[in-house]
Amino acid sequence: MASPAFHPLDCPDPAQVSFGTDGLRGHVGSAITSTLALQVGFWCGRVLPADGPVLIGMDSRTSGSMLVSALAAGLTAAGREVWTLGLCPTPAVPGLIRRFGAAGGLMVSASHNPPEDNGIKVFGADGSKLGSALQSRIEAGLRGEEPASAQAHAFGASHQRSDLLDLYKQDLLSSVRHQRLDGVPIVLDLCWGSATACGAAVFSELGADVTVLHGEADGERINVDCGSTHLEPLRRAVLERGAAMGFAFDGDADRMLAVDGRGRIVDGDHVLFLWGSALQDSGVLPDQRLVATVMSNLGFERAWQARGGQLDRTPVGDQHVHAAMVRSGAALGGEQSGHILSSAHGLSGDGVLTALQLASLCHGQGITLADWLDRSFEAYPQKLVNVRVPDRSRRKAWADCQSLTALVQEAERSMAGDGRVLVRASGTEPLLRVMVEAADPKAVEHWTQRLAEAADQHLNAA
């Protein structure tokens, strides 16, 4: 893959830089540049309130080293000590922040986006994604609205600390109490990304018979026709090898989707239902409560309520799930896309940890993932269509389009409470997402097509 043509010192208009649902993200050379990273690093160093080092991790993208260096330069210019972790899963960063009492951390990754994109996620001293107030201060600094007087103390220094990844691996093993998986045939799709740093190693350490797909760090192939957004290679490998289960990760390994031994997909809703049921049966699920987002399937919600459970819904984004779990004291939450958060394991979305939990729970009960999935809910037919809307203001203000909102209301009336419509602007890509689910699959197809066509017609009009 050829490198994109851009001037390395270009910087996007600061007025256009804002944190989305998962930090800053975009095409390297236009939305994300080394100059922007330098400034973001500096302002992170200024606004993070706690003392201590600032940790920086990265996925395998070829632009990652450039951006890590720029962030470290900005942070040290602001007087901060920096520890660079090298290639690691995103959840390693908040875990190590908490372990060492660090001031915060950054992850250079664009998650499931294509290789030519990159991004910056920022974490506070508690390991959670940075709150909106501090994000706003960083944005204000980029716009020149925060004072930038010289620090009274010396500049900081940067230290390479890739050795700390071993501590994260030990935390993963401890999360399942080192329970053995001797001889269990498991396929792992490591997506050419962050999961290559530890995914195969921890499963092999527990004795699993591991088959690895896309198992080297490759910044030009990360997420390309593999991983949690392209499950067919994993599904095919599980069936060909007669594996008990398979797990696919995204580029930075903070999410995971699974495939059972029959080739059926186990998405985040099923993970929540099955793991939540295990916690409920063990009497360790406070208020029988799970937290999910507006994208979670209606079949999941009704099946969980039939078990006597409560389901709280949040906007899309694991930071919203995190906030709701903290408020309610929920033990488990997540997203259909595979971000799963457990209060017993640090409240950070962690794909490798979730995969270990599923494998351990199944093996401990003497059942297969397919057996377990048979006990799960029947999902309502659901379809998601992405409509490309390059104009950000139109995308964000789609609800102001009366023709589109009227059509949404018509669709909801026609389903008479046995289905729903969700239209939302993506926080990470120039897309309007249109989702319809209903008991009647014909209604799903009909309304998805009509709504997507209407969105394209009205929001992309000249």
Swiss-Prot record:
UniProt modified residues of type Phosphoserine: S111
Post-translational note: Activated by phosphorylation.
A cellular-component GO term for this protein: cytosol
Keyword Ligase attached: no
Enzyme Commission number(s) of this protein: 5.4.2.10
Free-text remark on how the cofactor is bound: Binds 1 Mg(2+) ion per subunit.
Record InterPro entries: A-D-PHexomutase_a/b/a-I, A-D-PHexomutase_a/b/a-I/II/III, A-D-PHexomutase_a/b/a-II, A-D-PHexomutase_a/b/a-III, A-D-PHexomutase_C, A-D-PHexomutase_C_sf, A-D-PHexomutase_CS, Alpha-D-phosphohexomutase_SF
Residue positions binding Mg(2+): S111, D250, D252, D254
Enzyme class: isomerase
BP terms from Gene Ontology: carbohydrate metabolic process; peptidoglycan biosynthetic process; UDP-N-acetylglucosamine biosynthetic process
Cofactor entry: Mg(2+)
Keywords from the named record: Isomerase, Magnesium, Metal-binding, Phosphoprotein
Coiled coil ranges: none
Pfam family, one: PGM_PMM_IV
Recorded catalytic activity of this chain's protein: alpha-D-glucosamine 1-phosphate = D-glucosamine 6-phosphate
UniProt cross-references to CDD domains, sorted A to Z: GlmM
Single GO MF annotation: phosphomannomutase activity
Active site location: S111 (phosphoserine intermediate)
Gene3D superfamilies xref list: Alpha-D-Glucose-1,6-Bisphosphate, subunit A, domain 3 (3.40.120.10), Alpha-D-phosphohexomutase, C-terminal domain (3.30.310.50)
Family note: Belongs to the phosphohexose mutase family.
Job of this protein: Catalyzes the conversion of glucosamine-6-phosphate to glucosamine-1-phosphate.
Protein name as catalogued: Phosphoglucosamine mutase
